[in-house]
UniProtKB/Swiss-Prot annotation:
Keywords: Calcium, Cell membrane, Cytoplasmic vesicle, Membrane, Metal-binding, Nucleus, Repeat, Signal-anchor, Transmembrane, Transmembrane helix. Its cofactor is Ca(2+). The keyword Cell membrane applies. The gene is myof. This is Myoferlin. May play a role in membrane regeneration and repair. Residues 27-36 have a biased composition (Acidic residues). InterPro entries: C2_dom, C2_domain_sf, C2B_Ferlin, C2C_Ferlin, C2D_Ferlin, C2E_Ferlin, C2F_Ferlin, FerIin_dom.
Length: 1929
């Protein structure tokens, strides 16, 4: 299918109010193109979020649409670059994070880091080759793991987004943004940290933007720099996707098993051979419904629940219906998508209009809240499209279509779904059943209405695949599909017709005045409330698009401002009128969904904004051109508003069927042909109108190389209740017939039914279905109008002369003899070509409508015959005629014959519609065939054995009249069934339906036709593709219009042919209303071919033009020639300048314009008034020379000359005798006078050919070039200013005022000055200048404060800087091409032409003198020896070449045969090397002009790989007047790092510049502080007014001269950024180089000293950390006595130097979290003060050959641990300090709180490098239950010393010697601080006694008391008894 959009220069057809665009609509394709547009989301809880959050989101919703539509469907090279910079706030304790990044099946990971805020700064490259649409569907997945965990839960968090999201960002890049990580499996979890990343999508020819790494400018506030702004909070939402049911699922399984069941008597169901289930996928998650076996209309009634973070970075919810297979993989039935950007709105879409500055702001701010809504959809059906429905049992060649890859060619069912979104993160099932209440609710959305469709086929032309008869089928859904048995048989197919020749090249179907009609009824939901609005918005969009095209044409044509303002005002007024028109209301509609209401609200609000913005623009705009951007934004917005995601009505599909096989198709969106009773605007664009439809092959691999056919079809679709409205749209008279064929066979010389074999006496057209007259029953509502009649189908019986205007009749004269006898007349004297007996030539008459073109029959001797035309043969029995013939007579020959021919031509007096009277034989209506199934013909032959004739019976409607009666044709006409067949009634019915034999035949008869006259003015083409080996083509064009075509003449050996030809189609009969034809005229299709003498002509391209229709020829409107694109396989292959006009013609042709003049017989030129107006023009050609000419036919190009062609004029240079020695032309200027069009749009190109003069007179074309745009070479020859005069453009070749220049440099500086300079160079160097220029002021030291100047850093190549005009101001470089373009590739470059052109008008009066010549006083063409200095600063983002994702780059310089391979200075393991190298070599220009700088990857064992290369044209830099050979610095310095390096002083350069400008020399005064130049006065004071004067400056006159030079637009001192390219991925950046080149001609003396750009060396520093005390440390252990305690020690290191970890001794038994240490850590490190980064060099693995250098920010990590002797130590907490932004500590521990570590802007920080030392308390933190807690406080002294200070003030680690600066005494720890089992006595004293002493004392007292009591009670009885015995004792 071809869709065509006019170029911006095209104008609208004055008789076509609908514009000039004929586009075959394609709803599914649009959906595919837009389905990748990135969703930016919406958060209803934050409607008024700060900043422009919603606006940014809305722009993401909008902006993808513009870029996506221009994407190719051809696989291309792409490169995705992902840079992982750093992490922040990662959860976990003592983690070792690693990031894995996955894109398109490729995964890369970072190095393992330590800590919760790791710094990675690693870049990954992903090279892919796929189509852009496939690429944009790919996902980028960031996964963060804890590498120290071996558990399954090592995943910390992840983040996903589509590649399409990145592609839609400015520059296709997301730079230095934070992404929020979350747990994909736990919706209740919060943020899992942040990653800062940069992402780029680099396509062919794209330049990735350069990252700016400004530490001061970079925002460390994560929330404000999130990829999704903080105002739109990420929330967990649940998508409830309810999948109710599906219908019309096609057969997917083989019927073999069902057939076996049937054999054994089991039930079978062949209609439901499919086991469907639905797979839902979104953002990497997939959920499947249940499988329902053997059901083509399954009901799942299940809800899929998808929990995601919203707004989502992924766009499409993809639904794929699969057929389950037990043994093989599941087959896809079809795929459809829900695009979030279409079913949700953020509310920011409206705000974007205000941001443009012209929008209105009348709506309240709450409008955003009102129009924003979460994703919602349905209940609504989603249609599935894919491969054809017919099941074959073989692998489906179109299976990719079922996965949504490409445009589906057939309807494959539909799925009823509903989507709702809830702000809920509760864990629920992934899939659950839908409640019965919900199933009942959805019933009202399934109510069906009857729709009627009628399609009238007006023409089918441009057919090239001929053979079998052709018919067309129209279907909508399954209705009308002739191969499907699920619907009633309908009159959905046309009759079979055979194509006939159009007399020139194509074939067409001869429908004449009887047009085939198809009609069908179908049942769908009434969604008119959606489609009415869609059609209204589309009409509005089309009008705006047409008006914009008219406005652009007017701007391009440079119309007066007044006329321009009128066109613009008409556009604005039309837009305001359109947007003010009310939209249809949704009130009262039964099946309105939530999405309908929300989109209606969004549309109403958007239209109001556009309306108010247009009103405001109308009153305020002053510049028409400046408003175009905003108007086009409105157009984009309207196009988005016109999209309808809930379009459940399937497309109308037209199939071209040949031999019962589907050949080609076209899809027409139903809404385009739908009738609406709402209003005329709400009707479809082509409803009831004849439109042009180009069919296309399914999955066409040739991408439109051949058009199957061009259809003109009128389609009407409407509800059955309004079917009578069809009467007002219909034209002609509709006729309905039932038909059958009577068959007979020839048996024993008689015709009868005996030998029919399996054929029936009466059958359908295929002969396979038996029919009887009596069994035909008219459909309900119809009745017979007539009896059965014989009615032959003439369109199937075309003769050989059909369609020809000239034809040659032939007849053979036959003679026979016995061998050796005399020749006599044969029995059958005259026969035709088939050997059938024929009448004699004298008896043959000319057929009706033809006249003889010559006098009589002539012998044909242009064959393999003798001089009399005879050819001879031998008859061998049983044959009666010879099988072969020869030209020479032999004795044994028995037969001879000769061919008699006579030409005839069409009789112009006989109308094409006139027909001859039928003979009696023809009236019988029989058509004959040699065998059953063979092609039929009218005239009987002796070899015929089968014949048939068609019987037809006309029907008429019984209860209603008018064209709408055809919609009653529903159901079968009836068939005859035998008893056996009745047993298989269902199968017979299926077969009948399959062949469609019992459906009525509908046709539309036109009683009247109109004769038109077409003139196609083909003027010229440009930029065609070369298809011949000589680098050119021989183009000619076939021009097709309806059933006629003509061919232009062939133009030899050109890619820019000028045909200047008018093709006249004298009489073309078109049936239908002329006004309808004027509104939608047929297309003029031009196909351009390359003529080849041998082989088939090759297709160059196709162009489509809309003719201007003149219904009133008296109206004096001439068509305008316009450029139309020539397309081949969706590739632009040139342009064609043409116009066409279609004039309604009177019978006698009296109203036609006069014929144009003839250039040759029957070749008419383009007439005056249409052809361009020309003017005598001078073209001066500067032919400077040829470069880099490649060999031709294995021989070098040695003696070339140059030919210039333009407008039919040719000039040629002299021959270069030896190209290698003298590549320049001896005579450099050519002059030619040409008649060129005044309008720049019509100017022909300049063609350059290079001819090599070789021995023996051979002059092959060895290269050619076409210059299409000549406007840049136009000039005013009388211009008095001479800044741009060519003779003034050479500043170097003639810039020496003196022949010898001697520069003497004496070292007269005192010793002290030299010492001062050396010291200064330690403070500032060239890198200081570089970083000051790039804005990285933190790296440049005191450079700016000293008053030094900066240089210019260009982010592109110097020649691409716009103000330097490509450095081609003296001469341009034109690429020369040669050869044939194959496989859609461009021809190869075989050389370069150095030259230029000057084009200016010449006076028409020969007496007026010609203007002065432009190319004068040219420099000499001799060679120049030069010194070249190449400075390589650094590489940026080089393509990795090693397995570790890095490379080892080094520089290789190539200049002709000179090579510098700097392999020894490779830089290991980096993608961003700092080279800092300067190379110097000499060369001769122009022979050695191409300087090639390559970057290679160093490999020890294998061959070094090339990363990429860039090439610099030194000749252009040398010749350019912009002084690009050596950039001018800002100041003139005679010493220091900015010392002058050019050969000439500023005053000398200024004198040369004045001479080249033809200005007076500069005059100095006031001791060189005042200068007069070009009539302007300059003073030194005005340039140095606020500038600091330093000791390195030169004399005042030189400084002033330099300041003046810098005002003249010359190249400043600079560093350019050059992109590296590789042949592996051409046109895709492989990285960049920052560098510059100086070129010094040796004739001017030696240059100044070069710059020293050697990279800086890191300095050694020492960080001393004294850990004094800790406090409030978490008590992690319990002692044996039950006390909480910790054995505290502190561990510390600098990131990158983990192998130098240090730790204190252990403070045992801390009972209150206090620890005393007095311990010193000493961390040596290498540091770059200027860049504020640490340099770490170490081997990544033990097997690594080189150390890898890392640059890391200086940080200190300290951790507090609890010591365990018998288990692993316990981690308690940590603190991480940035030495550049060190948190100011608290002086006392009471003020040391957790707030000190908050990363906000109010934190007090200081640089330790500036403060040198700081002391105080810092808080440590840990994580517990997902929250950060205070883990303790640590008192430290931090001190940074350089190497010298460290040596002067030594200090040892810990408390080792030298223990000084300061001296650390052992800590005064409590007596309880010791290891308990090493000191039992201390354990008893300090642990047991201290805690249990009172227990012990109590126990002793208790023991004594008990002992006393025991003794007492022991001795008491004895004492008592003794007292009793001896009381007196």
């Amino acid at each position: 299918m071809i869709s065509y959009e006019p170029p911006p220069s095209a104008i609208s057809n004055p008789t076509d109010p609908g514009g000039t665009t004929i586009i075959q609509g394609d709803g599914e394709n649009d959906e595919e193109e837009d389905r990748d547009i990135v969703d930016a989301g919406f958060n209803p809880s934050v409607p008024g979020a700060p900043g422009q959050t919603d606006t940014q989101i809305a722009r993401r919703l909008v902006k993808g649409k513009k870029t996506r539509r221009i994407l190719s469907n051809k696989p291309q090279d792409f490169q995705i670059r992902i840079r992982v910079i750093e992490g922040r706030q990662l959860p976990g304790n003592n983690i070792k994070p690693v990031v894995k990044v996955s894109v398109g099946g490729q995964t890369h990971r970072t190095r393992i880091k330590r800590g919760n805020n790791p710094y990675f700064d690693e870049i990954f490259f992903y090279n892919v080759n796929m189509t852009p649409l496939e690429l944009l569907d790919e996902s980028v997945i960031f996964r963060l793991f804890n590498s120290g965990s071996i558990r399954a839960d090592s995943l910390i968090g992840e983040f996903k987004l589509d590649v399409g999201y990145i592609y839609d960002e400015p520059g296709h890049a997301v730079m230095r943004k934070w992404v929020l990580l979350n747990d994909p499996d736990d919706s209740s979890s919060g943020a899992k940290g942040y990653l800062k990343v940069s992402m780029f999508v680099v396509g062919t020819g794209d330049e990735p933007p350069v990252e700016k790494r400004d530490r001061e400018m970079e925002d460390d506030d994560v929330e404000s720099n999130l990829l999704l702004p903080a105002g739109v909070a990420l929330r967990w939402v649940t998508f409830f996707l309810k999948i109710y049911r599906a219908e019309d699922i096609p057969q997917m399984d083989d019927a073999f098993a069902q057939t076996v069941k049937e054999i054994f008597g089991a039930d079978s169901d062949k209609k439901n051979l499919v086991d469907p289930f639905v797979e839902v996928s979104f953002a990497g998650k997939k959920v499947c419904t249940n499988r329902i076996e053997k059901n083509a209309n399954p009901e799942w009634n299940q809800a899929v629940n998808l929990q995601i973070k919203f707004p989502s970075m992924c766009e499409n919810i993809k639904l794929t219906v699969y057929d389950w297979d037990r043994l093989t993989k599941n087959d896809a039935v079809g795929t459809t998508c829900l695009s979030l950007s279409k079913i949700a709105a953020s509310g920011g879409e409206i705000e974007e209009y205000d941001s443009t500055g012209t929008g209105s702001s009348s709506l309240e701010a709450t409008t955003e809240k009102e129009v924003g809504f979460l994703p919602t959809f349905g209940p609504c059906y989603l249609n599935l499209y894919g491969s054809p429905r017919e099941y074959t049992g073989f692998p489906d060649p179109y299976d990719d279509l079922n996965f949504g890859k490409g445009e589906g060619v057939a309807y494959r069912g539909r799925v009823l779904v509903e989507l709702t979104t809830k702000l809920d993160n509760s864990s629920i099932k992934k899939i659950e059943d839908i409640s019965s209440d919900d199933i009942l609710v959805v019933e009202k959305y399934q109510r069906r209405r009857k729709y009627c469709l009628c399609a009238v086929f007006h023409s089918a032309t441009m057919i090239q695949d001929i053979g079998e008869a052709i018919q067309f089928e129209v279907s909508i859904g399954n209705y009308g599909n002739k191969f499907d048995s699920t619907c009633k048989p309908l009159a959905s197919t046309t009759q079979y017709s055979r194509p006939i020749f159009d007399g020139n090249y194509y074939y067409y179907l001869p429908w004449s005045f009887t047009k085939p009609v198809v009609t069908l009824t179908s049942y769908w939901e009434d969604i008119s409330h959606r489609l009415d609005i869609v059609n209204i918005l589309i009409a509005m969009t089309d009008r705006l698009q047409s008006n914009i095209s008219t406005l652009k044409s007017a701007i391009q044509a440079k119309l007066p401002d007044v006329r321009l303002a009128e066109i613009w005002m008409r556009l604005i007024d039309q837009l305001i009128e359109d947007t003010m028109r009310p939209m249809p209301s949704l009130e009262g509609k039964a099946n309105v969904t939530v999405l309908d209401k929300q989109r209606d609200k969004l549309r109403q609000t958007s239209l109001k904004y556009i309306q108010e913005a247009a009103i405001k623009m109308r009153g305020e705009a002053t510049d028409v051109k400046a408003t175009l951007t905003e108007i086009e934004d409105w157009l984009d917005r309207l196009q988005q508003l016109s999209e309808e995601p809930q379009n459940s009505m399937p497309d109308v599909i037209i199939w071209m069927i040949r031999a019962e096989k589907r050949l080609a198709y076209a899809r027409v969106p139903a809404h385009q042909v739908l009738f609406s009773k709402t209003s005329e605007e709400a009707c479809g664009k082509y409803c009831g109108k004849t439109q042009t439809v180009f069919l296309q092959y399914p999955l066409d691999k040739t991408k439109g190389l051949k058009i199957p056919t061009e259809l003109r079809v009128n389609i009407w679709l409407g509800l059955s209740e309004v079917e009578k409205k069809f009467n007002s749209y219909s034209e002609g008279t509709f006729s309905v017939y039932a038909e059958m064929y009577e068959n007979q066979a020839l048996l024993l010389g008689k015709w009868g039914t005996t030998g029919l074999l399996k054929r029936h006496k009466f059958s359908d057209v295929t002969g396979s279905i038996k029919l009887k007259r009596e069994s035909f029953l008219p459909p309900k509502g119809w009745e017979w109008e007539d009896d059965w009649k014989v009615d032959p189908e003439r369109s199937l019986l075309t003769e050989a002369d059909a369609g020809h205007t000239e034809f040659t009749d032939e007849i053979f004269e036959n003679e026979a003899r016995y061998p050796g006898g005399e020749w006599k007349k044969a029995d059958e004297t005259f026969t035709d070509a088939n050997g059938e007996k024929s009448a004699s030539p004298s008896d043959l008459s000319c057929p009706f409508g033809w006249i003889w073109d010559d006098d009589g029959w002539m012998r044909d001797i242009n064959r393999a015959v003798d001089e009399n035309g005879w050819e001879y043969g031998l008859t061998i029995p049983p044959d009666s005629k010879p099988k072969s013939w020869v030209a020479a007579e032999k004795m044994y020959h028995t037969n001879r014959r000769r061919r008699l021919v006579r030409k005839r031509k069409k009789d112009p007096k006989v109308s094409t519609t006139s027909k001859a009277a039928l003979t009696p034989q023809e009236q019988e209506g029989w058509e004959y065939a040699a065998l059953i199934g063979w092609k039929f013909h009218i005239t009987p032959r002796s070899s015929d054995t089968f014949r048939r004739r068609r019987w037809r019976r006309k029907m008429a409607p019984s209860d209603q009249h008018g064209a709408a009666a055809i919609f009653k044709l529903e159901g079968a006409l009836g068939t005859d069934m035998t008893e056996d067949e009745e047993k298989k009634g269902s199968e017979k019915q299926t077969a009948t339906n399959v062949f469609g034999a019992n459906t009525p035949i509908v046709s539309c008869t036109f009683d009247k036709f109109y004769t038109y006259h077409l003139r196609c003015y083909i003027y010229q083409a440009r930029g065609l593709t070369p298809l011949d080996k000589d680098s050119f083509s021989d183009p000619y064009a076939h021009v097709s219009f309806l059933h006629r075509s003509k061919t232009t003449e062939t133009i030899r050996s050109t890619l820019n042919p000028t045909w200047d030809q008018t093709l006249i189609f004298n009489t073309i009969d078109i049936y239908g209303d002329p006004h309808a034809v004027a509104q939608n005229p047929p297309n003029v299709v031009i196909e351009i071919f390359d003529y080849d003498q041998v082989g088939k002509d090759e297709f160059l391209g196709r162009s489509v033009c809309m003719p201007m229709v003149k219904l009133n020829p008296e109206v004096d409107i001439a068509p305008k020639l316009l450029w139309y694109p020539v397309m081949n396989s969706n590739k632009h292959c040139g342009d064609l300048l043409l116009a066409a006009e279609l004039i309604i013609r009177e019978k006698d042709g009296s109203n036609l314009p006069i014929l144009p003049s003839q250039r040759a017989p029957q070749i008419y030129m383009v007439p005056q008034g249409i052809r361009p107006v020309v003017q005598l023009t001078a073209i001066e050609i500067l032919t400077w020379g040829l470069r880099n000419m490649k060999s031709y036919q294995l021989a070098s190009v040695t003696s070339p000359s140059l030919i210039v062609e333009c407008g039919g004029e040719i000039v040629e240079t002299a021959v270069i005798k030896n190209l290698k020695k003298t590549p320049n032309f001896y005579s450099s200027v050519l002059f030619m006078k040409v008649l060129l069009p005044k309008d720049e749009m019509y100017v022909p190109p300049i063609i350059i050919k290079i001819v090599d003069h070789r021995p023996f007179g051979r002059k092959p074309v060895v290269g050619q070039c076409t210059i299409e745009c000549l406007e840049e070479f136009r000039c005013d020859p009388y211009l008095t200013k001479h800044e741009d005069a060519p003779e003034l453009r050479v500043a170097r070749l003639t810039s020496s005022p003196l022949r010898d220049v001697v520069i003497e440099v004496e070292d007269t500086k005192p010793l002290l000055a030299n010492q001062l300079q050396e010291k200064e160079e330690e403070v500032v160097d060239w890198w200081s200048k570089y970083y000051a220029s790039t804005g990285e002021t933190e790296k440049c030291g005191q450079y700016i404060q000293k008053g030094y100047t900066t240089l210019k850093v260009y982010k592109c190549e110097l020649e691409n800087v716009s103000e330097f005009r490509g450095l081609t101001d003296f001469c341009d470089t034109f690429k020369l091409y040669r050869g044939k373009a194959e496989d859609s590739d461009d021809p190869s470059v075989v050389g370069e032409f150095k030259g230029s052109f000057r084009i200016y008008p010449l006076p028409d009066d020969p007496n007026i003198p010609y203007p002065p010549r432009q190319f004068l006083e040219l420099p000499g063409t001799e060679s120049q020896e030069c010194i070249v200095r190449i400075y390589i600063v650094r590489g940026i983002d080089l393509q990795p070449k090693d397995n570790n994702g890095l490379c080892d780059p080094y520089i290789k310089i190539t200049l002709n045969k000179k090579v510098i391979e700097d392999r020894d200075h490779y830089i290991p393991n980096t993608l961003n090397p700092l080279f800092g190298r300067m190379y110097e070599l000499s060369c001769f220009l122009p022979q050695e002009k191409d300087l090639k700088i390559s970057v290679y990857d160093y490999d020890t064992l294998t061959r070094d790989e090339k990363v990429g290369e860039t090439t610099i044209d030194l000749e252009n830099r040398f010749l350019s007047r912009f002084g690009s050979h050596c950039g001018l610095p800002q100041t003139y310095c005679i010493s220091g790092i900015n010392q002058w390096r050019d050969q000439l002083t500023p005053t000398q350069i200024l004198q040369n510049f004045a001479r080249l400008k033809s200005s007076p020399p500069p005059v100095f005064s006031d001791n060189g502080t005042r200068l007069t130049f070009s009539s302007k006065d300059y003073t030194l004071e005005e340039f140095e007014n606020n500038r600091k004067i330093h000791q390195h400056l030169g004399p005042p006159n030189e400084r002033l001269a330099l300041y003046v030079l810098r005002t003249q637009g010359l190249v400043p001192e600079h560093v350019e950024t050059r992109t590296l390219y590789s042949t592996f991925q051409p046109n895709i950046s492989q990285g960049k180089l920052e560098m510059w080149v100086d070129v010094f001609p040796k004739s001017l003396g030696p240059p100044g000293p070069p710059f020293n750009i050697t990279p800086r060396k890191a300095k050694k520093y020492v960080l001393r950390v004294i850990v004094w005390n800790t406090k409030d440390v978490i008590l992690d252990e319990k002692s044996i006595t039950g006390e909480e305690m910790s054995d505290i020690y502190v561990k510390g290191w600098i990131p990158g130097n983990e192998e130098n970890k240090q730790k204190t001794d252990v403070h045992y038994r801390s009972l209150d979290g206090e620890g005393n240490f007095n311990w010193r850590f000493v961390f040596p490190f290498e540091y770059l003060p200027a860049e504020q980064l640490c340099i770490v060099s170490k081997k990544e693995h033990f097997w690594s050959l080189d150390k890898t250098e890392f640059k890391l920010p200086p940080k200190l990590i300290l951790q507090i641990w609890d010591n365990d002797k018998f288990s692993l130590d316990d981690y308690l907490g940590f603190v991480e300090l940035d030495l550049h932004r060190t948190t100011i500590p608290a002086k006392v521990p009471e003020k040391c709180s957790f707030n000190l570590l908050d990363q906000d802007k109010h934190s007090k920080v200081a640089s330790l490098f500036e403060q040198k030392s700081m002391k105080g308390w810092w808080p440590c933190h840990a994580e517990k239950d997902g929250k950060r807690i205070l883990a303790g406080k640590i008192e430290m002294t931090l001190e940074v010393l350089n190497e010298k200070d460290a040596e002067e003030r030594p200090a040892g680690k810990g408390r080792d010697e030298p223990n000084m600066n300061p001296k650390l005494d052992p800590p005064n720890r409590p007596d309880t601080s010791f290891l308990w089992f090493t000191n039992p006595c201390k354990t008893m004293k300090f642990i047991i006694w201290r805690r249990f002493k009172w227990v012990f004392i109590g126990l002793i007292i208790l023991l004594l008391v008990l002992l006393f009591l025991g003794v007492f009670f022991y001795s008491l009885p004895g004492y008592v008894s003794m007292k009793i015995v001896k009381p007196n004792l």
